[in-house]
Swiss-Prot record:
Protein keywords: DNA damage, DNA excision, DNA repair, Endonuclease, Hydrolase, Nuclease
UniProt keyword Iron, yes or no: no
Record protein name field: UV DNA damage endonuclease
Annotated family: Belongs to the uve1/UvsE family.
InterPro entries: UvdE, UvdE_bac, Xyl_isomerase-like_sf
Disulfide bonds: none
Source organism of this protein record: Bacillus subtilis (strain 168)
Gene Ontology molecular-function annotations: endonuclease activity
Length: 320
C-alpha cells in the first residue's frame, strides 16, 4: 500500500518563490491603460515563473503531488478586468503542463471559500461559475484538464442546511459539464460534515476529498470512518484517480480549526493505520503552514516507524 504526499502552492525552502504575487484592483485602477496591461503581464509572468521553479523543486525532491496557487493570474475574474491571460503566456502554460505530464505529477486547484453553489443569490452562483471556469481555463492551457481536479467546499447553510443543499443541486447545473467532471468536494470544519458531503458527492457523481482535520474540528461530524472512508474511496472510481485526503493538525487546543506550522504525526497515525484494512493507495495533501518543510519533516518521522519504507521524497510504502 503506497501513500503519496504533496503540499500547497509555495515552497518555503525556495527564496522569493511565491506563485501568488498580487495586483490589487485599487492599484490597477490608478494606472494608465498601458501601465495596466504591463502590470498584469509582469505579475502573471512572475507567478508562472515561480510555479515552474516550484515544480522543478518538487521533482528534484521526489514529491508527487502539488496544488497550484489560485492566484497565478491577477484580476482574472474581476468584472472590470477579466483579461485574456492565456494568449500572452501560451508557452509558459504549456511548459508547466509538459513538466506535470513528463514527471507524472498529480496536480489540483482549490478556489477560495467564496466559490460556492449554495447561495440563493444568483450573483454568487454566477461568480462561482466564473471562478471555476478561470481555474479550468488554466488547466486547459497547461494541457492537463483531463488529469487534474478543482476542489471546493459545498458552501454555507444560510440558516437551513436542507434548503441550501437543495440549492446546491440546482445551482450546480449552471456549471459546464466539462468543468463539473473535474470538480471535487471537501467536508468543512463548521458546516457540512463528512456524511453530508459524501451524500452530495454520491448524488452528483463527484469525487469526495476527505479532510481529516475538518472532521476532527467540526463538532457536528460524528461519521463512522469505517463506513465513510470506503464510500469516499468509491467516489474516485469514475475519474480513475487515487482517493485524496487533506492532512493538517490543529495549532492548539484553543485553536483547533487553525492549521499548525507542521503536522503532528501522532494526530494522523490513527487515520493512516485505518486505511490498512482496505489496502488502497491514498494520496495526501499537506495543508500545514510550513508547506514543503512540513511535508519533509513528516516523511522523516513516518519513515522511522517499523514496517514503513520511504520510497521517494514524498512517498511511503506503508506496513502491510
Amino acid at each position: 500500500m503506497i501513500f503519496r504526499f504533496g503540499f500547497v502552492s509555495n515552497a518555503m525552502s525556495l527564496w522569493d518563490a511565491s506563485p501568488a504575487k498580487t495586483l490589487t484592483f485599487a492599484r490597477y485602477s490608478k494606472l494608465s491603460k498601458t501601465e495596466r496591461k504591463e502590470a498584469l503581464l509582469t505579475v502573471t509572468k512572475a507567478n508562472l515563473r515561480n510555479t515552474m521553479r516550484t515544480l522543478h523543486y518538487i521533482i528534484g525532491h521526489g514529491i508527487p503531488l502539488y496544488r497550484f496557487s489560485s492566484s497565478i493570474v491577477p484580476l482574472a475574474t474581476h468584472p472590470d478586468v477579466m483579461w485574456d491571460f492565456v494568449t500572452p503566456f501560451q508557452k509558459e502554460f504549456r511548459e508547466i503542463g509538459e513538466l506535470v505530464k513528463t514527471h507524472q505529477l498529480r496536480t489540483s486547484f482549490h478556489p477560495n471559500q467564496f466559490t460556492l453553489f449554495t447561495s440563493p443569490k444568483e450573483s454568487v452562483t454566477k461568480n462561482a461559475v466564473t471562478d471555476m471556469a478561470y481555474h479550468y481555463r488554466m488547466l486547459e492551457a497547461m494541457g492537463i484538464a483531463d488529469r487534474s481536479v478543482i476542489n471546493i467546499h459545498i458552501g454555507g447553510a444560510y440558516g437551513n442546511k436542507d434548503t441550501a443543499t437543495a440549492q446546491f443541486h440546482q445551482n450546480i447545473k449552471q456549471l459546464p459539464q466539462e468543468i463539473k467532471e473535474r470538480m471535487t468536494l471537501e467536508n468543512d470544519d463548521k458546516t457540512y460534515t463528512t456524511e453530508e458531503t459524501l451524500q452530495v458527492c454520491e448524488q452528483e457523481d463527484v469525487p469526495f476529498v476527505f479532510d481529516f482535520h475538518h472532521f476532527y474540528a467540526n463538532p457536528d461530524d460524528h461519521a463512522d470512518l469505517n463506513v465513510a472512508l470506503p464510500r469516499m474511496i468509491k467516489t474516485w472510481e469514475r475519474i480513475g484517480l487515487q482517493p485524496k485526503v487533506h492532512l493538517s493538525s490543529p495549532k492548539s487546543e484553543q485553536a483547533i480549526r487553525s492549521h499548525a506550522d507542521y503536522v503532528d504525526a501522532n494526530f494522523l497515525l490513527p487515520l493512516l493505520e485505518r486505511f490498512r484494512q482496505w489496502g488502497t493507495n491514498i494520496d495526501f495533501m499537506i495543508e500545514a503552514k510550513q508547506k514543503d518543510k512540513a511535508l519533509l519533516r513528516l516523511m522523516d518521522e513516518l519513515s522511522s516507524i517499523r514496517g514503513v519504507k520511504r520510497i521517494g521524497g514524498g512517498a511511503l510504502q506503508w506496513k502491510s
